[in-house]
Amino acid sequence: MRVVDNLRHINERINEACNRSGRSSDEVTVIAVTKYVSPERAQEAVDAGITCLGENRDAELLRKQELMKGNPEWHFIGSLQSRKAKSVVNSVSYIHSLDRLSLAKEIEKRAEGTVRCFVQVNTSLEPSKHGMKKEEVIPFIQELSGFEHILVAGLMTMAPLTDDQDQIRSCFRSLRELRDQVQKLNQPNAPCTELSMGMSNDFEIAIEEGATYIRIGSSLVGNETGGVQQ
């Protein structure tokens, strides 16, 4: 299907989820996850009205940036190795995977300006997922108070791939509650107003629990494997 048609359907579902939770759809931004599709397909998303694109490989991110038009906002959404930070930090608007002090130090070292980051939290406690434990987040953010180039824009999580909606909702709700705790710190470089959570299979629940960024791949742009894999 055309991306514009997929986006229309997704926007309808976003509106319905917002209506159920008393929110405005203006509070929710769609990140098109384009890591598995060609630059041409990603361009189709931008032409359809998508303003944010998400990549998880530095090489593919830079390749698409060179080839695409329309000046979309780029989000790095994958686990970021410290040695790859140099090629990413000054090329994206947001990094969604800050999860350790060594990476924060590398970002601080390489940044030419403010880098907006989401602290990744493993709310499901699955060993296969990256992210900090919930109890580690506030001490970590407090430790970032002296980092001049890092702005903690919000928190990010991924729910387990399950049909148990209560389990999914619990992960998203716990992230929102943790975000509220971070905001009470009143830390200048950690406004933490955003929540990056929800993907193709669970974004409606995420919206109901307060998501401000949702990461949509397969149901929006498909999964054509036209991206460069490493």
From Swiss-Prot:
Domain of life: Bacteria
GO molecular function per UniProt: pyridoxal phosphate binding
PTM annotation (N6-(pyridoxal phosphate)lysine): residues: 35
NCBIfam families per UniProt: YggS family pyridoxal phosphate-dependent enzyme (TIGR00044)
Similarity section: Belongs to the pyridoxal phosphate-binding protein YggS/PROSC family.
Function as written in the Swiss-Prot or TrEMBL entry: Pyridoxal 5'-phosphate (PLP)-binding protein, which is involved in PLP homeostasis.
The protein's name in its UniProt record: Pyridoxal phosphate homeostasis protein
